[in-house]
Amino acid sequence: MTLKDLNIGETAVVGTVGGEGALRQHFLDMGLIPGEKVTLVKFAPMGDPMELSIHGYELTLRLDDAARSWVTLAKAPAAKKAEAESEKPVEHPGLGEGGRYHTKKGENPLPDGTTLTFALAGNQNCGKTTLFNQLTGSNQHVGNFPGVTVDRKSGAIRNNPDTEVTDLPGIYSMSPYTSEEIVTRQFIIGEKPTGIINIVDATNIERNLYLTMQLMELDTPMVLALNMMDEMRGNGGTVRINKMEAMLGIPVVPISAAKNEGVDELVDHALHVAKYQERPGRMDLCGEEDHGGAVHRCIHGIIHLIEDHAKAAGIPVRFAATKLVEGDQRIEAALKLDQNEKEMIEHIIVQMEQERGLDRAAAIADMRFHFIHQLVEQTVVKPRQSKEQLRSARIDQFLTGRYTAIPAFVGIMALVFYLTFGVIGLALQNLLEVGIDALTAAMDSTLTAWNVNAAVHSLVIDGIFTGVGSVLSFLPIIVTLFFFLSLLEDTGYMARVAFVMDKLLRRIGLSGRSIVPMLIGFGCTVPGVMASRTLPSERDRKMTILLTPFMSCSAKLPIYSLFAAAFFPEHAALVMVSLYFLGIAVGILMAILLKGTVFKGEAVPFVMELPNYRLPGLKNVVQLLWEKARDFLQRAFTVIFAATIIIWFLQSFDLRLSLTADPQQSILAWLASGIAPLFAPLGFADWRVSTALITGFMAKESVVSTLTILYGSSAAFAAALSPAAAAPLLVFCLLYTPCIAAVASVKRELGGKWAFIMVANQCIVAWLAAFGTRLIMML
């Protein structure tokens, strides 16, 4: 019997785990090991993938993986006895505290003035970034989707200038499966921080502690932060901190990062262990008597063989030994073992497999989880079922239900766009426009009264106020869109969307996880491209990155608003929503084309955690909105301001650098006329339009300011083009190359070759789509 054969609600025990390579290692690291209980929770609305419950959290898996290679199932064992609460109290070990762990005489602190560097490491979605913000005062994006931190961020701990803490992408183990996991592993092993702050979700402690076991093997000063303890206590659970600290040999501090509880104590312990280089008191997780001692003898035999190699490579020997058993090729290459040593190690591992009755990777995973089970049984009093889990289950009945999930997704996205473009965002935009118009009129009157030079007057009013002001008026719409997208992410709904849409996206060659970078792309292409790092497959990453720019970013909203109001005022909201769906449709067609040509093959297995729904914190939402507004304002007063000044200058002066009142005699007209013929078949061969498209490569918002400056006003622009020409131009703006910042992010992720291919491809697609629109409008 395989995992696929389970019925909803049935529980069984894992017999064997199939698969191979990094994928199988990832399954083991996620807790799917022989002897572990697993429960089928439900299937996705389209029947695939499935949702499993293991170690107290939810995991997704596709049916073909379950049927082909996952498990054989045995009879479920009897339930374990409840944790005892009546054990004798354990004296506080005092790890990470002065005068308790070591004597004054035995101290060997780092020199004063040494910068203490910390790696903030933990599983995805455990609250790392929230803790980072509390530690440093930085304003990193806080979300509720696995992989919010897609690059490492650093900052000094408050009131401790000689420190640097780095927020690393979340990982489940030190066996890298995705590019973000590689970032974390390379930092911890390669840059050797003076200390590690390991944050653990106390409500999901078994799965989180798996990474802790591996971090302890690095022999780096370390403190364990038990996050979300307020939730655990609120559900009737608790953790015997003293006992856990004694068993692990590292300081354990209960905290609530969201409420800033226990953070000061955590900082004190972290500074102490780093300053005095107090290393973990325990690294050996398997005793000589555990399962006959097979794994213990294997690891220690390998340690004896590779000790000199590990020291030369700068890799902790215990960590190197366990990774060699798991078959980690990167570690093996770094150790530079000769052939004889490799054969001896292989002989030791094979003997262990025979004695233990498990393959090498499963034996190491079992060793860690066996210790975790012992630790949890002695230190954790679990609640029967948390309020957060019950609430999530009730919400999921509707949002991931068989008949309700797709309508719910469509309805939610439609509501987001309607409120953004038709109600809240529009009302705020109109209000801001009134203020900008009043300020412009007042400045115009002031400059006239002061008899300011005509050129300067034109620069200030026609260039700065008209150009930048027209872009600023769209700030409310952009902020409103980001507000709703952040709500979807913070609550945990984004992860459900990936679960619901996986089967559909597989048909066009993508994974369900690809939906999240593309949804983020509706806000801005740059973070959407960066979010693709959460995808484990290079193929999936490239496809997702190339498709994300087809999701219309918020910077294009000013263009849509201008065109819709000028040419289609009676159907403005419909036109704007239709553009979004057109971008999605073109992206789907491109995905199908790429799947059949450049990126042949299937998407990688869909393995992802489904976090509990959480109410977004008001502070986090306001913080995110401020970041987006600030970013937009910075762009408005830097890139867009500079582009506006340049456009004004090129428009106001001729080739002899003489001020001209005739725009057709300007330098700008001469430059733009060179590419204008390319757009003649599309119905807009006007040099002013060509100029706007060029400036749009710098920043999409510049298209509006450029058109407003060159035509003099929105009304003049509306009079210059017919709807039959405006529609193709609108489609071209939707689909042509993203801004320079987005292109730079693609270059950073995939290299210059793919960035150029993306720009060329989108320009060609945009031209063809605009030409088709022109033909339709001429009917």
Provide a role label for each language-model segment:
Residues 408-419, 481-486, 564-566, 579-593, ...:
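Hydrophobic core segments of alpha-helical transmembrane domains in multi-pass membrane transport
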Residues 434, 438-442, 495-525, 600-624, ...:
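Juxtamembrane inter-helical linkers in multi-pass membrane proteins
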Residues 550, 554-577, 741-751, 770-779:
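Transmembrane helix-loop junctions at the membrane interface of multipass transporters and ion channels
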Residues 92-173, 191:
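Conserved G1/Walker A P-loop phosphate-binding module
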Residues 232-285:
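Canonical P-loop GTPase G-domain recognition
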Residues 355, 362-366, 382, 423-464, ...:
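Extended, low-charge hydrophobic alpha-helical regions
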Residues 249, 276, 283-453, 659, ...:
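Extended helical scaffolds that flank P-loop GTPase cores
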Residues 160, 185-252, 559:
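Conserved C-terminal guanine-recognition region of P-loop GTPase G domains, centered on the G4
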